[in-house]
C-alpha cells in the first residue's frame, strides 16, 4: 500500500542497494503470517456461521458478513504480498498483479469502511426510530444496501487502474521492480486526501454522532415501544384474565431485549473504535507524506502501520466471539466443539418469531435465546414490545 512515486524510480543508481536487516525480514514474515492466517480463518468462519445458521441471518449480521469479506480481501491482497516483498525485496507479481492486487487492496479497505457505516446507521434506526425500522431494518433491504456498497466501491476503486505501473530501479548490484505510480506525487496526493476524507473522517464523525444518540436511548432512557402494541393490549379484552402473567413475562423479556441490544451495540461500537484507532497511523502517515517534499518511509514504522491494518481486519471475529453469546455458540457448533447440553427438568426453550408488515420480509433482532421455567408456561403466547416491530413469543417444550 505504500506505493512509490514514479518520478523517484525508473532510474539507474550507482550505489549498491540498501540491505534490509535480517531481523526486520523475520519479524515481518512471522507477524504477517500469524495475523493474516488467523484473520483469514476467523473471517471465513464468520461468513460460514451466518450463512449456515438460520437464526443468525439478521440485518446486522448481514453487514458483518460484508465486513468479513472486505477484511478477507485486505488480508489476502495486502498482507500476503508483503511476505514475498520481504523475502525477495522486489515485486514478483508482474504488471497485471500490480493492477489487480492494488485494486483489491483499496476495494477491501473502502468496502469495510462503508460496511461499518451501514451497520452503524442500521443500529441507529433500529434503536432510535423503531417504527421506521419495521420497513428499513429488514434482511432484504440490508442485502440491497450491501450490493450498492460493493458496486459503488468497485467502480470508485477502478481509478487505481489508471494510476499504477511497474517501476524499475537499477542498482550497482541488483535490479529492483516495484509496484508504484506512473504519475508524480502532486497528482496522486489529492486522491489520497479524498480517500482519507470519504472513507475515514466522514464515517468516524458519523459513527460518533449516531452512537451518541444510541447511547442516550439505551443507557439514559427506556427503549421506545411500538404504539401499535400498546393500543392492541387495551383492545384485546380476552387477554385480561392473563394480564398479570403477561405483564410479568413482558417485563422479563423487555429487560432481556434491552440487555441484548446494549450488548450488541457495545460489540459494534468496539468494532468502530478499533477501526478508527488501528487505521489512524497509516491514514495519518499518508496525509503527512502528502505535504512533505521527501516522504517519511522508515521501515519499522511502515511495518507498524501495516500490522495495525492487518490487526483491524483480523480482530473482528475475536470480538464477536468474546462479546456475543450467539456468535460464540455458532462458532463452537461450526467447529464441532459444542458440548451436549445438560438436561434440566422443567426448563423450556423460547422460540422467537417476529412478523413484519411485509410478509415476504423477515426481520429478526439479536436477542439471544433464553430459558424460562414452568411459572410462565400457563399461557401459550405472550406478547411484548420489541423496539423495532410487533413481536410474538411461542413457547415450545424442548
UniProtKB/Swiss-Prot annotation:
UniProt cross-references to PROSITE patterns, sorted A to Z: G_PROTEIN_RECEP_F1_1 (PS00237), G_PROTEIN_RECEP_F1_2 (PS50262)
A GO BP annotation: phospholipase C-activating G protein-coupled receptor signaling pathway
Gene: TRHR
Gene3D superfamilies for the chain: Rhodopsin 7-helix transmembrane proteins
Entry's Gene Ontology cellular component terms: plasma membrane
Cytoplasmic compartment segments: 52-61, 122-144, 216-266, 320-398
GO molecular function: thyrotropin-releasing hormone receptor activity
The organism of origin for this protein: Bos taurus (Bovine)
Protein name per the record: Thyrotropin-releasing hormone receptor
Topology versus the membrane: Multi-pass membrane protein
Matches recorded under InterPro entries: GPCR_Rhodpsn (IPR000276), GPCR_Rhodpsn_7TM (IPR017452), TRH_rcpt_1 (IPR002120)
Family that this chain belongs to: Belongs to the G-protein coupled receptor 1 family.
Amino acid at each position: 500500500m505504500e506505493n512509490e512515486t514514479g518520478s523517484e524510480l525508473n532510474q539507474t543508481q550507482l550505489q549498491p542497494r540498501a540491505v534490509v536487516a535480517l531481523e526486520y525480514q523475520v519479524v515481518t514474515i512471522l507477524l504477517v503470517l500469524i495475523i493474516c492466517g488467523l484473520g483469514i480463518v476467523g473471517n471465513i468462519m464468520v461468513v460460514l456461521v451466518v450463512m449456515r445458521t438460520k437464526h443468525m441471518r439478521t440485518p446486522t449480521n448481514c453487514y458483518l458478513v460484508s465486513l468479513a469479506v472486505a477484511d478477507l480481501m485486505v488480508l489476502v491482497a495486502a498482507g500476503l504480498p508483503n511476505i514475498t516483498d520481504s523475502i525477495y525485496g522486489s515485486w514478483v507479481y508482474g504488471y497485471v498483479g500490480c493492477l489487480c492486487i492494488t485494486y483489491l487492496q483499496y476495494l477491501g479497505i473502502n468496502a469495510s469502511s462503508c460496511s461499518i457505516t451501514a451497520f452503524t446507521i442500521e443500529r441507529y434506526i433500529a434503536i432510535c426510530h423503531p417504527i421506521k425500522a419495521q420497513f428499513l431494518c429488514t434482511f432484504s433491504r440490508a442485502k440491497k444496501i450491501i450490493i450498492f456498497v460493493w458496486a459503488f466501491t468497485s467502480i470508485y476503486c477502478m481509478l487505481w487502474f489508471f494510476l499504477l505501473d511497474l517501476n524499475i530501479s537499477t542498482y550497482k548490484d541488483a535490479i529492483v521492480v516495484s509496484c508504484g505510480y506512473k504519475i508524480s506525487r502532486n497528482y496522486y496526493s489529492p486522491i489520497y486526501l479524498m480517500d482519507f476524507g470519504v472513507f475515514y473522517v466522514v464515517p468516524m464523525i458519523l459513527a460518533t454522532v449516531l452512537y451518541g444518540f444510541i447511547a442516550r436511548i439505551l443507557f439514559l432512557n427506556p427503549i421506545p415501544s411500538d404504539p401499535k402494541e400498546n393500543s392492541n393490549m387495551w383492545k384485546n379484552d380476552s387477554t385480561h384474565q392473563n394480564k398479570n402473567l403477561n405483564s410479568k413475562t413482558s417485563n422479563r423479556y423487555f429487560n432481556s431485549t434491552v440487555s441484548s441490544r446494549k450488548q450488541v451495540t457495545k460489540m459494534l461500537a468496539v468494532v468502530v473504535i478499533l477501526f478508527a484507532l488501528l487505521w489512524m497511523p497509516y491514514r495519518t502517515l499518508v496525509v503527512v507524506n502528502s505535504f512533505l517534499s521527501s516522504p517519511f518511509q522508515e521501515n519499522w514504522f511502515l511495518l507498524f502501520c501495516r500490522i495495525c491494518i492487518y490487526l483491524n481486519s483480523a480482530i473482528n471475529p475475536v470480538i464477536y466471539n468474546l462479546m456475543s453469546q450467539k456468535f460464540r455458540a455458532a462458532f463452537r457448533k461450526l467447529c464441532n466443539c459444542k458440548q451436549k447440553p445438560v438436561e434440566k427438568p422443567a426448563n423450556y426453550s423460547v422460540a422467537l418469531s417476529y412478523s413484519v408488515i411485509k410478509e415476504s420480509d423477515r426481520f429478526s433482532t439479536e436477542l439471544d435465546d433464553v430459558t424460562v421455567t414452568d411459572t410462565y408456561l400457563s399461557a401459550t403466547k405472550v406478547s411484548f414490545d420489541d423496539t423495532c416491530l410487533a413481536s410474538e413469543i411461542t413457547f415450545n417444550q424442548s
